[in-house]
């Protein structure tokens, strides 16, 4: 944990129309996160945005209806991350439940196939008898793949949420809330959310066509797959706007009630998470990394198989396999992070200031882990980072992570415009992107990326800061308030879990688990004694027995151990006073 340069409190925002019976603390927290009206607190499915607002969805459902009616062989082509895995599993399960007996799936291998619907992946789908291809969480930039599919006589339905380029692939139908002419109010749907909306629309069309009645089957309850929607949404770190909070809350509720896929249950077991107390953060920090480990180090088909399987015994075997991959991923990441920090420290020792944007490369880095590495270095140095690893044939694959104030994909697009041929290909979002380039061009890219970011970004944004919700009163430092905050979510990207600040007397401090600081503190003005823990501290600084008072940025939490529940604080940052 690296102390930030400054602590900033959120500006107070006046609620407009929040319920009168809402506690003042929650009103303040919600209003500062853009929730100012009662309807923004909706968590039931009736509050979901209607699927009819997604452009192209009618054409897409007609394609699928005709495919079902004609028993067309559908191959769902996914992606090798958690969003792609949940999108793939949800689509296959939903199509089967809707009466499609001729559907299978294909997930590109990160190392052999690369990202998206490439011509090579189309050939694999063709070999599996594809008469129609449906992409999930990819496809919006797959011009060559779509053209190749058409050359083979295979129609293509693209469902994606990534930002489109200047031109769209010539797919037979495209659903993407980020299309320029799409009126869908939420631009933050994950790939699994887009797939879920398509299945809802298809069910409506099938019902209207008499599909279920003619076969003597009941229309399926697609809400059964909201556990997958929640997992993919949180793991993909898309903003939790009102619509995504509804999807996530509904999925969490199903998991807590024990109504989840065996694969998710097995992941919860291996991660030692109690379904009854599951929070959105558990999906992002416990389940998501294990699922992602398959795509990072091996093949995401293992992850999809886990989500598809109906047998808890089989699910536990696959979950153990994913857990082992995740442990290996952690070890690889630890070594890569040490090497990356050495590169940064070498630059600092040379007297140079770090550029506004960091591009880093090491010939022994693992291309499946560079995204996590970029995220870690970004958090430490608070600037956009792209980490590269060798991809073979003299090329590099990079993964970038950005900060507020720099749109990563727009930055890459600008570089591509200014310096054609610098990159082989690129794509992504505001906060994350992927790209590839020739190894011989890395030094040039490193310089140009650093210069562009320095030119584009406000230097003040390169200073790390912690954004706090202010102080808690002593009367608010209770188990009841901690439980209220836990229940008030789901918290996540762009809707952060409440973080408070305050000054405390430091009464006890010791290191546990090698790098975690366990403390006991008391508010300086008096109040309850609080147990706290700060994860991954700098052990060259802490513990410091000379420090008697500290300023903390912390979350109020409940520690549950052997049936006992006690109040504790999770310390994000600590400053000696």
Task: Describe the residue ranges of each PLM region.
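Mid-to-C-terminal polyanion-binding domains and interfaces
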Residues: 69-70, 314-320, 324-360, 393, ...
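Acidic-glycine-rich active-site phosphate/pyrophosphate-binding loop
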Residues: 66, 166-176, 264, 521-528
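Histidine/acidic-residue-rich, glycine-tolerant segments that coordinate divalent metal ions
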Residues: 136-192
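A short acidic, amphipathic alpha-helical/loop segment
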Residues: 144-148, 373, 480, 484
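Conserved acidic residues
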Residues: 131, 172, 551
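Hydrophobic helix-and-loop "lid/oligomerization" segment in the mid-to-C-terminal part
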Residues: 2, 8-132, 152-153, 207-441, ...
